[in-house]
Amino acid sequence: MSEFINVTVVREANVFFNGGVVSRTVIFPDGTKKTLGIMQPGEYTFNTGAPEIMEILTGELDLKLPGSDLWDRIGGGESFEVPANSSFTMKVLSLTDYCCSFLG
């Protein structure tokens, strides 16, 4: 879906890593949340509270998921899941547009 209808967008930005990652929170009528954001090239480690699905809309990154020593290349049109209460690392190779869905 390229468009969300009847949602609330939080005006203030979520800024991480000195502006290397910036997103906006979108709240749906049922209370679920997503963030829409941009990542600049760089390496970032995120911690999760809830499980997440990260959809990469455009761009390219190398990804290391919890419990893995391997890096996987992820590009536009691909997605990955991250369990709750874990961390994952991304080496962003080019400007990357993403949508993160918070589950549970």
Curated annotation (Swiss-Prot):
Q: Which Pfam families match?
A: Ppnp
- The protein's enzyme class: transferase
Coiled-coil regions listed in the entry? none
Residue pairs linked by disulfide bridges in the UniProt entry: none
EC assignment: the record states: 2.4.2.1, 2.4.2.2
Q: Keywords for this entry?
A: Glycosyltransferase, Transferase
A molecular function GO annotation: purine-nucleoside phosphorylase activity
The protein's annotated catalytic reaction(s) are: a purine D-ribonucleoside + phosphate = a purine nucleobase + alpha-D-ribose 1-phosphate; adenosine + phosphate = alpha-D-ribose 1-phosphate + adenine; cytidine + phosphate = cytosine + alpha-D-ribose 1-phosphate; guanosine + phosphate = alpha-D-ribose 1-phosphate + guanine
Q: Which interval of the chain is the signal sequence?
A: none
GO cellular component terms listed in the entry, alphabetical order: cytosol
Similarity comment: family membership: Belongs to the nucleoside phosphorylase PpnP family.
Q: What exactly does this protein do?
A: Catalyzes the phosphorolysis of diverse nucleosides, yielding D-ribose 1-phosphate and the respective free bases. Can use uridine, adenosine, guanosine, cytidine, thymidine, inosine and xanthosine as substrates. Also catalyzes the reverse reactions.
Q: What is this protein called?
A: Pyrimidine/purine nucleoside phosphorylase
